[in-house]
Structures are given as structure tokens and as C-alpha cells.
Amino acid sequence: AETLLSLLDQPLLKLADVSNLTFRGLILEATRANAIEIRGGASNRIAGCLIRNIGNTGVVIEGGTGHAVVSSDVSDTGDGGVSLTGGDRQTLSPGGHFVENCHFQRLGRWSKCYVPAVAMTGVGLRASHNLIQDHPHCAILYWGNDHLMEFNEIHHIALETGDVGAIYTGRDYTFRGDKIRHNFIHH
């Protein structure tokens, strides 16, 4: 058996206005904060990584363009899996961030509501080909325009909450152009 105790209250990786970096095959665990934070920059990739036992969110991407989390496993977080924020709602310029071919499970150990596997805020973000399971609230939560959610498999969500959907948004008639298609949602 292994026991982990983290005293670290900062991200394990923190990128600010950095572009064109790929982190591949890393195991990131044991911080009380977010595992990875990317702010600004362009075209950074988190690929084939295992992100687990995190106090807050697995990956937080804010601003910049074209960042991606691909083929990675995110599990056992205190809050959510991946949070994407990008694009400009005034001009409808897309952010181009995406989460693809990832496996999310056992998230939201600390916070139970509104900490999805994938959160998308802004314009032109994508969640596709992901497996999302064993979650207390919604699997994908989005705000904004022109987002694409497709080919995701979602099961065993809303395990500890109610009044929620697998893919969820709400109460803003300006959220237009979003596409939800070809997802497999089951229990």
C-alpha cells in the first residue's frame, strides 16, 4: 500500500504566455491545488498523462488559443477534470481549445456540484471522444457560443446530486451555435 500526503498548495505545472510545448507521458499527482494551469500562449498540449489525487481541478486552461488535453486519464480530483476558457464572446472569435480521447472518473470528491469532467466557457471549444464516468454532478458543463460536444461516452453521473443533465448549461439565450451530437449517455 502507498500513502500520499501533499503539503503543496500550488500547481505542479504552471505555464504563462508559453507556446508550442507538449508534456507527454507524465504522472501528475499529490497537490492540494490544480495539477496544471495554462494561461495565455498558444498550442500547448497535455498528452498521454495520468493526472490523479489532485485537490482542485486536473487542468485549468484560461485564454490563449489552441491548447489541448489529449489521450490523458484524470481521476480522483477534489473538484473537476479540465476547465477550458477561451475565445471572445463579443467578436465570436474561437478559442480553439479542446479535450479529446480522455478518460475521467471519480471527480468531485470535495465539491459535488458544478465541477464537471469538462467545463467550457467562451467561444469555439470542443470536447470529443471522451469517456466520463462515476461523477457526482454533470459530465460536461458549457457556457458560450459555438462549442462542440461529440462522440463522448457518459455514464454513472449525477450520483450525489439532482436537477442536472449529463451535458448541462442554463438560462442564457445568447448561447448560440453550440452543437451536441453523437454522444452515448447511459447508466
Please report, for each region that a protein language model flagged, where it lies by residue.
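Extended, small-residue-rich solenoid/repeat segments and analogous flexible loops
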Residues: 1-40
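Right-handed parallel beta-helix
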Residues: 7-16, 19-30, 33, 43-56, 65-79, 93-108, 116-120, 171-174, ...
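Short glycine/acidic-rich loop motifs that flank beta-strands on beta-rich extracellular proteins
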Residues: 11, 32-37, 55-62, 78-84, ...
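Residue-level marker of regulatory loop/turn positions in helix-turn-helix DNA-binding domains and
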Residues: 15, 38, 61, 91, ...
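Asp-box/WD-like beta-propeller blade repeats and closely related beta-sheet repeat scaffolds
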Residues: 85-89
